[in-house]
């Protein structure tokens, strides 16, 4: 028994709902704790590496690929997925449209990339231990799932509440999703406009350890 991959898009409405819920937990965690993720890879050497040499930039963002991003946008707006679909996607009722693993998932400028059934966190330097990054990732996603559970366990209509929870999470945290070129100078300006952090150095990052949400 190898368990269940919770980030594997499913073949049934139930499996799709599970996938979307856990996907949203990861999206929310990366957005809420982008500072802590940057801290887990902070070192003098990595400060020089990030943003060059096929390494992602210091700005934390998530790559989902165009197909999955369009599906999330359709859910957020309660609109058809594309011009060929007349029916609005309902979580727990409909299956997701088939989508291919995006060929650009090899884009090394993405710090946190979805590659079909898993995420890759690409900011860690080769000489650094993965223990701190894993601890922050697992703990932050667990915290988001705890918040989701508090909402869903009180739901009178589970499917309606689940749909609204996922829709609300997408709307509030879509700023962290970026499928473009992380090396492009325009991304720095766009990230600032979105309210994302650009912690270029270790001292800049470490200061956020004392943020109230992180203590």
Where are these regions (language model features)?
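Catalytic or ion-translocation cores adjacent to nucleophile or general acid/base/metal-coordination motifs
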Residues: 2-43
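Acidic, glycine-enriched catalytic cores built around paired aspartates
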Residues: 29-215
């Amino acid at each position: 028994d190898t368990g269940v991959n919770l980030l594997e898009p499913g073949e049934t409405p139930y499996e799709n709902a599970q996938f979307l819920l856990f996907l949203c937990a990861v999206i929310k965690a990366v957005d809420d704790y982008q500072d802590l993720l940057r801290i887990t890879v902070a070192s003098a050497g990595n400060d020089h590496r990030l943003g060059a040499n096929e390494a992602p930039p210091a700005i934390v963002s998530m790559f989902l690929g165009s197909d999955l991003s369009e599906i999330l946008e359709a859910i957020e707006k309660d609109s058809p997925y594309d011009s060929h679909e007349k029916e609005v996607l309902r979580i727990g009722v409909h299956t997701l449209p088939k989508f291919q693993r995006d060929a650009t998932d090899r884009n090394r400028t993405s710090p946190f990339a979805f590659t079909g059934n898993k995420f890759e966190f690409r900011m860690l330097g080769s000489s650094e231990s993965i223990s701190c990054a894993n601890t922050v990732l697992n703990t932050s996603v667990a915290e988001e799932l705890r918040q989701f559970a508090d909402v869903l366990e009180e739901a009178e209509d589970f499917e309606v509440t689940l749909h609204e929870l996922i829709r609300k999470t997408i709307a509030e945290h879509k700023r962290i999703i970026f499928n473009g070129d992380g090396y492009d100078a325009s991304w720095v300006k766009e990230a600032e406009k979105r309210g994302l952090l650009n912690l270029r150095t270790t001292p800049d990052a470490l200061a956020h350890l004392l943020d109230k949400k992180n203590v």
